[in-house]
Swiss-Prot record:
Encoding gene per record: rpoB
Keywords assigned: DNA-directed RNA polymerase, Nucleotidyltransferase, Transcription, Transferase
Any one Pfam family match given in the protein's UniProt record, by short name: RNA_pol_Rpb2_7
GO biological process: DNA-templated transcription
Family: Belongs to the RNA polymerase beta chain family.
CDD domains: RNA_pol_B_RPB2 (cd00653)
Protein name per UniProt: DNA-directed RNA polymerase subunit beta
Species whose genome carries this gene: Blochmanniella pennsylvanica (strain BPEN)
Complex and partners: The RNAP catalytic core consists of 2 alpha, 1 beta, 1 beta' and 1 omega subunit. When a sigma factor is associated with the core the holoenzyme is formed, which can initiate transcription.
KW Nucleotidyltransferase (keyword) present: yes
InterPro entries noted in UniProt: DNA-dir_RNA_pol_bsu_ext_1_sf (IPR042107), DNA-dir_RNA_pol_bsu_external_1 (IPR019462), DNA-dir_RNA_pol_su2 (IPR015712), DNA-dir_RNAP_su2_dom (IPR007120), DNA-dir_RNAP_su2_hyb_sf (IPR037033), RNA_pol_bsu_bac (IPR010243), RNA_pol_bsu_CS (IPR007121), RNA_pol_bsu_protrusion (IPR007644)
Enzyme nomenclature, EC number: 2.7.7.6
GO CC entries: DNA-directed RNA polymerase complex
Record's catalysed reaction(s): RNA(n) + a ribonucleoside 5'-triphosphate = RNA(n+1) + diphosphate
Length: 1341
């Protein structure tokens, strides 16, 4: 296996046995591909914006004299880059310009002749752009558009499962769902009549819509029924026989032909009778005359003499009618065939309750349902019906809907029109009747073949189309009313409706969400999330159990583990690792093709619809060296069921053992040993892990860590290979390999690192280089780590030495005892950055002012502010400190003469303003790390703004000049190469200035051409950097676009350092969560025979009932990994030779049977071996992939190799007494996470504060600075103790006795600790409520 530069530094031992046939796909492709499709310009296959424009344009005027045509569109360049948009609170978007052509016609006779055309480029608003990491910056905030799982358009057959009526009768229904347009429902009622509903309105007999489609009664009956022909010969009635139709009937007469009795009267007609009739080729039998009585005629019969109707179609034959038919000379009578078993006469019965008789009546009936109260006219009724299902403007099944529709009706043709046709409606009714007759099955609505993914591009296109349709109406009106000779396309188009529709979607849609940026995993998971909620989806209140449940088709497409706990369970899911959406939006998963029992490496992606036809083997099926199945019977899946199949029946095999789970679940080692509920918690809690100061890779991982870290975008990845030419904390420069460099470029790649940026969750984003000067890197190598990554691997927590044992009750109920060493070494210390904003507005009384001159504030409070009233960078602040001084004008009050005199004597300042400064919130303390000031355009900037501006300009100039120097240096190196190969002496060359080199004239024309090209590049480079500097200068010095009424915004960024403390929540990766109960001194912690204390003590009772045994296996394997590291460390300390280290590490890497990982350390140089050993001395990282992990034997072997007991248990000694514990204890290394549920964010203290308006009781919750509720049960507790005075105090002066608490406050100030309880306000409220019921209660003194 070839390792990249970063991987060589620290190779993770892989215990996986199954070969990795398919690489993990790019994890953000669902977002990025969808948006690329949205903005892709492809006239051949229009999609996204192109499709939206084509569906609305051309727009014709009502009179047909003018037409506005679409030619093409173009997206401009964004004004600000991503970082600038985040700082300024702007949207990262590009202007959309559309080229339109206005054609004006002149009528000549019946034809229109083009009189004039005007072509123009029109601005149509801004389109938000996706960043490289699949997010959008909207108003400076990073957001994610979550994909939606919704019911696919098409036709669906369903039943009520007998729940509608008390009789339990199953009522079947069909629904045609378009992508856009009216829904069409067909449903049976209790009497087996068939009805239709349009858009869930009042139901109509189904024959109404058939008549509206211009079918007559005869045609309707002929479409839905087979006919039976009776012949009358010599007063004898004969029936044309089709034997199959008799199956299951009871003979009401002897069925005999030529004296041979086939079935006796009263006998049930069975299969043997039908076989005999067929064998003897009986096609006609004699039946009694009364047999035809009650049968329904299939067409009209008229008197042959008078032409008066004897019987109309769909009428039952009576003896009189039969007599008239015979008398009129009819020799054959046609009736419709039906029976009670499998040919119901539902349409015939429905025709009888249908009051309409022709097309017009039917159209009027539909019009009355759709437009109740409006008088119907023939034209209006026809127009409405035509527009409902047959107009491309109003109705669209879409290619997906048509494909599903045709598949459901077993049609050969997959794609067709987007509107409905007559045959479509008839075929749906036919299939529904067949299902009612017991032929065919209803659809499973939770099958992933019936639910599709709607991603960001598609949703944005729909929203854009809504905006375009609004514009279309306005354009039509303007074309009809305006003077066409003067109008231009620009005059016709108003971009505001389009911008508003797009902005509304990105800012306020339920699926446009504030990105979860806790750590790289939470970012990736959020982008791969699939929600069944949102517009056009389900609501959590109405969603039942079935839709939330795991479905067999979820296999390899949607993760069965990762879903939230609570009301959204099962409605919000996560995409599986290898899943992708196909062109129709259905989820596909990859499989290896199996041919004649041999598994190939040929990969096929199958959707849930296609998968149902195949037999699919699991990924952990045993194969021999050439890919044949070892076992004759193989466990496989087919049509949603698992079973054993012969190996030659298998069609496909899973690609990987982890293809069933999502990214988060695939990061849990030994997932196969955890209970599903705990695995769900583990997957969810990894997303809440806070990035700590020093990230540490997990000793026991799954091999997915690198893919997640790279795809999340938090690391910096080398775009091209080369040599590290320069590296510092904020910049990495790579001199690119010659074979990867184009001739017309400098061959230098500069990577700027992100430093101490605030994330959406207030965690700190900081990138650190992980390469050194002069090192070689290749394309795709990680060159800088981001938050929660370590050498290019995801590192959410820390490896902790843990012991499973009780310890003085401190680990009761999932609590954890943590060693002081963890705090001292800052293992779980994290930095949180808070953004506090001060806004200066223009009020009615005058503008608010940001100043250091604040009334009634002492000098000490102002000591950290500069003269502009803004805090210094680097200031240490605590709760209540002023960050930005601001005064707001208040209404002038009338002063008494005494006050005027005092004002004149003492000169009290600023009486007409009040203090509205920005202060540090209570309970927060930290360091000011940055201040940003935004001033409205046209307002003079204050001194601090100008200082910040000059610093920014200085920094930009420095960065750009350094970049220029780097590029110049590389360019002059190439110039030097050209000159030296031309024979110029190196010594002479370096005696002249570098700029003079460009003026030299060479004799060789080819070398002269190369020199002139490099000279051109040099001057282009200079020009480009000057232009860059000019653009940056303009951006920095220009005023800011602020909302109306806002003059200035000051943003202060505080960095808060949070050490771990009791009350903080921690968790492992197996759903084993708990709260820290105590930080224990190191000397009191249990320790082993070598004197090494444990870091965390966990409760062993937390394992058996939770059934997450994975944590125990992780602990043992972690111990073994650390043991290997300790041995390597010992060898390094002993200065052993590289060969000895190589042999030992090779032995460790080779351990395990049938491992897919083959490492040859002989190919590593001694320097690489030493570097690898240094990185392994804290423990050898191990990968144990899900469902393909390390076995118990392998863990024991690794423990033996590291010189540890194979039981994984050791004797511990009590740190307090020094005595050994009676029994051995499981000790090992577990990867622990600090979750973003910190006690500092949850706890607060209140003495006085705000009160509820009605009850006058203190508010609740930290956000309201509320108090702790003393509830009913707490009152009982005090009653039980008989603490009456304490109880009285709690219920009166400490709660809602307004007068009592005011007196109490005064008494405390006076030093008098007496209280006088009065009447609680809540009692007064109770009195008022009783009085509102007209019961008067008065209190006696």
């Amino acid at each position: 296996m070839v390792y990249s530069y970063t991987e060589k530094k620290r190779i993770r031992k892989d215990f996986g046995k199954r070969p990795q046939v398919l690489d993990i796909p790019y994890l953000l492709s669902i977002q990025i591909d969808s948006f690329q499709k949205f903005i892709k310009q492809d006239p051949e296959e229009p999609c996204g914006l192109e499709a939206a424009f084509r569906s609305v344009f051309p727009i014709k005027s009502y009179n047909g004299n003018a037409e506005l045509q679409y030619i093409k569109y173009q997206l401009g360049e964004p004004t600000f880059d991503v970082k600038e948009c985040q700082t300024r609170g702007a949207t990262f978007s590009a202007p959309l310009r559309v080229r339109l052509c206005l054609i004006i016609y002149e009528r000549e006779g019946l034809n229109n002749i083009i009189k004039n055309t005007k072509e123009q480029e029109v601005y149509m608003g801004e389109i938000p752009l996706m960043t490289n990491n699949g997010t959008f910056i909207i108003n400076g905030i990073e957001r994610v558009i979550v994909s939606q799982l919704h019911r696919s358009p098409g036709v669906f057959f369903d039943s009520d499962k007998g729940k509608t009526h008390s009789s339990g009768k199953v009522l079947y229904n069909a629904r045609i769902i378009p992508y856009r347009g009216s829904w069409l429902d067909f449903e049976f009622d209790l009497k087996d009549n068939l009805f239709v509903r349009i858009d869930r309105r009042r139901k109509l007999p189904v024959t109404v819509i058939l008549r509206a489609l211009n079918y007559t009664t005869d045609q309707i009956l002929n479409i839905f029924f087979n006919k039976v022909i009776y012949e009358i010969q010599n007063n004898t009635l004969y029936m044309h026989l089709i034997p199959e139709r008799l199956r299951g009937e009871t003979a009401s007469f002897d069925i005999a032909v030529n004296g041979v009795i086939y079935v006796k009267k009263g006998r049930r007609i069975a299969a043997k009778h039908i076989r005999q009739l067929k064998k003897d080729k009986i096609s006609k039998i004699e039946v009694p005359m009364d047999y035809i009585i009650g049968k329904v005629v299939i067409k009209d019969y008229f008197d042959k003499n008078t032409n008066i109707p004897i019987v109309t179609a769909n009428t039952e034959i009576s003896s009189d009618i039969l007599h008239n038919l015979i008398r009129s000379g009819y020799e054959s009578i046609e009736t419709l065939f039906s029976n009670d078993l499998d040919y119901g006469n539902y349409i015939s019965e429905t025709l009888r309750i249908d009051a309409t008789t022709n097309k017009f009546d039917a159209l009027v009936e539909i019009y009355r349902v759709m437009r109740p109260g409006e008088p119907p006219t023939k034209e209006a009724a026809e127009y409405l019906f035509e527009n409902l299902f047959f107009s491309e403007e109003r109705y669209d099944l879409s290619s997906v809907g048509r494909m599903k529709f045709n598949r459901s009706l077993q049609r050969v043709q997959i794609e067709d029109l987007g509107t409905l046709k007559k045959d479509d409606i008839v075929d749906v009714i036919k299939k529904l009747i067949d299902i009612r007759n017991g032929k065919g099955e209803v659809d499973d609505i939770d099958h992933l073949g019936n639910r599709r993914i709607r991603s960001v591009g598609e949703m944005a296109e729909n929203q854009f189309r809504i905006g375009l349709v609004r514009v279309e109406r306005a354009v039509k009106e303007r074309l009809s009313l305006g003077d066409l000779d003067v109008l231009t396309p620009q005059d016709l188009i108003n971009a505001k409706p389009i911008s508003a529709a797009v902005r509304e979607f990105f800012t306020s849609s339920q699926l446009s969400q504030f990105m979860d940026q806790n750590n790289p995993l939470s970012e990736i998971t959020h982008k791969r999330r699939i929600s069944a909620l949102g517009p056009g989806g389900l609501t959590r209140e109405r969603a039942g159990f079935e839709v939330r449940d795991v479905h067999p088709t979820h296999y390899g497409r949607v993760c069965p583990i990762e879903t939230p706990e609570g009301p959204n369970i099962g409605l919000i899911n996560s995409l599986s690792v290898y899943a992708r959406a196909n062109k129709y939006g259905f989820l596909e998963t990859p499989y290896r093709k199996v041919q004649n029992g041999v598994v190939s490496n040929d990969i096929h992606y199958l959707s849930a619809i296609e998968e149902g036809d195949f037999v699919i083997a699991q990924a952990n099926t045993n194969l021999n060296s050439i890919g044949e199945f070892i076992d004759d019977l193989v466990t496989c899946r087919n049509k949603g069921e698992s079973g054993l199949f012969k190996k030659d029946q298998v069609d496909y095999m899973d690609v990987s053992t982890q293809q069933i789970v999502s990214v988060a679940a695939s990061l849990i080692p030994f997932l196969e040993h955890d209970d599903a509920n705990r695995a769900l918690m583990g997957a969810n809690m990894q997303r809440q892990a806070v990035p700590v100061l020093c990230s540490e890779k997990p000793l026991v991982g799954t091999g997915m860590e690198r893919a997640v870290a790279i795809d999340s975008g938090v690391t910096v990845v080398a775009k091209r290979g080369g040599v590290i030419k320069y590296v510092d904390a904020s910049r990495i420069v790579i001199h690119v390999n010659k074979n990867e460099t184009h001739t017309e470029e400098s061959g230098i790649d500069i990577y700027q690192l992100t430093k101490y940026i605030r994330s959406n969750q207030n965690t700190c984003i900081n990138q650190r280089p992980c390469v050194s000067l002069g090192e070689l890197v290749e394309h795709g190598d990680v060159i800088a780590d981001g938050p929660s990554t370590d050498l290019g691997e995801l590192a959410l927590g820390q490896n902790m030495r843990i012991a499973f044992m009780p310890w003085n009750g401190y680990n009761f109920e999932d609590s954890m005892l943590v060693s002081e060493r963890v705090v001292q070494e800052d293992k779980f210390t994290s930095i949180h950055i808070q953004e506090l904003t001060c806004v200066s507005r223009d009020t009615k009384l005058g503008p608010e002012e940001i100043t250091a001159d604040i009334p009634n504030v002492g000098e000490t409070a102002l000591s950290k502010l500069d003269e502009s009233g803004i805090i210094y960078i680097g200031a240490e602040v605590i709760g209540g400190d002023i960050l930005v001084g601001k005064v707001t004008p208040k209404g002038e009050t009338q002063l008494t003469p005494e006050e005027k005199l005092l004002r004149a004597i003492f000169g009290e300042k600023a009486s007409d303003v009040k203090d509205s400064s920005l202060r540090v919130p209570n309970g927060v303390c930290g360091t000011v790390i940055d201040v940003q000031i935004f001033t409205r355009d046209g307002i003079n900037k204050d001194k601090r703004s100008l200082i910040i501006e000059s610093e920014k300009l200085k920094q930009v100039k420095k960065d750009l000049s350094e970049e220029l120097q780097i590029f110049e240096s590389a360019l002059f190196d190439r110039v030097c190469d050209v000159l030296m190969t031309s024979g110029i002496d190196k010594k002479k060359l370096f005696e002249t200035s570098r700029n003079a080199w460009l003026d030299l004239v060479l004799s060789d024309p080819e070398k002269q051409y190369q020199l002139s090209q490099l000279t051109k590049q040099y001057f282009d480079l200079k020009r480009m950097f000057e232009k860059k500097l000019e653009i940056q200068h303009r951006k920095i010095t220009q005023g800011d676009e602020l909302a109306p009424g806002i003059l200035k915004i000051v943003k202060v960024y505080l960095a808060v350092k949070r050490q771990i403390q009791p009350g903080d929540k921690m968790a492992g990766r197996h759903g084993n969560k708990g709260v820290i109960s105590k930080i224990n001194p190191i000397e009191d912690m249990p320790y082993d025979q070598h004197g090494i204390p444990v870091d965390i003590v966990l409760n062993p009772l937390g394992v058996p009932s939770r059934m997450n045994i994975g944590q125990i296996l992780e602990t043992h394997l972690g111990m073994a990994a650390k043991g290997i590291g300790d041995k390597i460390n010992f060898m390094l300390q002993q200065h052993k030779e590289a060969n000895q280290l190589r042999r030992f590490m090779q032995q460790a890497y080779n351990l395990g049977e049938g491992s897919r990982q083959h490492i040859n350390l002989n190919s590593f140089s001694d320097i690489e071996i030493l570097k690898l050993a240094k990185n392994l001395k804290k423990g050898m990282p191990i990968a144990t992939p899900v469902f393909d992990g390390a076995t118990e034997k392998e863990i024991k072997d690794l423990l033996k190799l590291s010189g540890l007991p194979s039981s994984g248990q050791i004797t511990l000694f009590d740190g307090c007494t020094g005595e050994a514990f009676e029994r051995q204890v499981t000790v090992g290394y577990m990867y622990m996470l600090k979750l973003n549920h910190l006690v500092d964010d949850k706890m607060h203290a209140r003495s006085t504060g705000s009160y509820s308006l009605v009850t006058q009781q203190p508010l609740g919750g930290k956000a309201q600075f509320g108090g702790q509720r003393f509830g009913e049960m707490e009152v009982w507790a005090l009653e039980a103790y008989g603490a009456s005075y304490t109880l009285q105090e709690m219920l009166t002066v400490k709660s809602d006795d307004v007068n009592g608490r005011t007196k109490m406050y005064k008494n405390i100030v006076d030093g008098n600790h007496m209280m006088e309880p009065g009447m609680p306000e809540s009692f007064n409220v109770l009195l008022k409520e009783i009085r509102s019921l007209a019961i008067n209660i008065e209190l006696e003194d």
